[in-house]
């Protein structure tokens, strides 16, 4: 390609979309909050201790009993908790919650790539990433609801541990970032190519400029 041809391609080829400072700030804030939600959810699931009821500690991975002057005695066999269906149900809850983190990580990656490598597909990547965050919210909420339903007879509001509230906060952030990402993508949608040309002409075909 000659120098003139290369210059013409730069002038006529697709240009990177220009974004305002406010839009860039909002998109960066969504990415940062999503990363925070991924960290909160990951820590919460790895720890897994979500409910403390008197001397019993219920979690995704362990069931623990606590005495006054000794360390917690934890068992991997969740059936020892003597709660119907808790062994199978906790397996489902932690699997769904872990899948939520995976979906959120992929969504976060697409959000970052759409901002770092801006091209004509950046908006599509951002939209897909936002939808993945919505999937992460649904899965994370499913894990929380499964845990609550399994232990509905033992639950007290003050019994929920910090790790449970971390997962709850992460689930809320997944939803907030997903809806915010889709909303800002729709607000900043560029008009079709023919729209601007149509606006420059009158109804009789004469140019307005």
Swiss-Prot record:
Transmembrane segments: 25-45, 96-116, 131-151, 155-175
Coarse class of the protein's main subcellular location: membrane
GO terms, molecular function: calcium channel activity; voltage-gated monoatomic ion channel activity
Keyword Cell membrane: no
GO CC terms: monoatomic ion channel complex
Keywords: Calcium, Calcium channel, Calcium transport, Ion channel, Ion transport, Membrane, Transmembrane, Transmembrane helix, Transport, Voltage-gated channel
Claim: Lipid metabolism is one of the keywords in the record: no
A Pfam match: TMEM37
Membrane topology: Multi-pass membrane protein
Subcellular location: Membrane
Domain of life of the organism encoding this protein: Eukaryota
Similarity-based family: Belongs to the PMP-22/EMP/MP20 family. CACNG subfamily.
UniProt subunit comment: The L-type calcium channel is composed of five subunits: alpha-1, alpha-2/delta, beta and gamma.
Function recorded in the entry: Thought to stabilize the calcium channel in an inactivated (closed) state. Modulates calcium current when coexpressed with CACNA1G.
Protein name, entry field: Voltage-dependent calcium channel gamma-like subunit
